[in-house]
A protein has these predicted regions:
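Electrostatic, structured charged patches in enzyme active sites and in nucleic-acid/phosphate-binding
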Residues: 1-134
C-alpha cells in the first residue's frame, strides 16, 4: 500500500502510484529488450509463518490431537519480481515519505531476513532485494 499517492490505471492494470506505473514501463521495456525475464507484479511472500499449537481435545470416546492456529501468517507483497542474470530480483518502489510510514521498515527487515534465509538454504546468492526510492 502506498500512503501519499492515489491509484493509477495504465496499460489495463492498476498501480498503487504513478511512480510504480512508470517503473513498470521501464521494466517492461527491459524485458522486451531481453535484459530481464519473468516480470511479475504484486508477488506475495510469507515473512512470518502462522503460529500453530497442538492441543489434546477430549471427545466422548477418545482424545484427539488438534492443531490450533493462534496467529495467521504475515505476508510481504513485492511490487515487482523478475529474473536478471540468473538472480531473482524482488523490487519495491517507494517514495521517501512512504519509506517511513507505519509498518514498512519492519516488513523490509523481515523480507531481507527471508531472502537471506533462502540464499543460505540454496548456498548461493539467488535472491536480491532492491528498493527504488523516488
Amino acid at each position: 500500500m502506498k500512503y501519499f499517492s492515489s491509484k493509477v490505471k495504465m496499460y489495463g492494470m492498476t498501480f498503487d502510484s504513478k511512480t510504480e506505473a512508470s517503473h513498470y514501463m521501464k521494466l517492461k521495456t527491459r524485458q522486451d529488450n531481453g535484459e530481464i525475464t519473468n516480470l511479475q507484479l504484486q508477488v506475495e511472500f510469507e515473512i512470518i509463518p502462522k503460529l500453530v499449537v497442538d492441543e489434546l481435545k477430549v471427545l466422548k470416546t477418545k482424545t484427539k490431537l488438534v492443531h490450533k492456529v493462534l496467529e495467521r501468517a504475515a505476508h510481504y507483497t513485492a511490487d515487482f519480481v523478475y529474473e536478471e542474470k540468473g538472480k531473482i530480483i524482488i523490487e519495491e518502489v517507494k517514495s521517501r515519505g512512504t519509506m517511513l510510514a507505519r509498518d514498512y521498515p519492519l516488513r523490509r527487515k523481515l523480507i531481507r531476513k527471508k531472502i537471506a534465509e533462502m540464499n543460505n538454504y540454496l548456498g548461493v546468492e539467488r535472491y536480491e532485494f532492491r528498493e527504488i526510492i523516488r
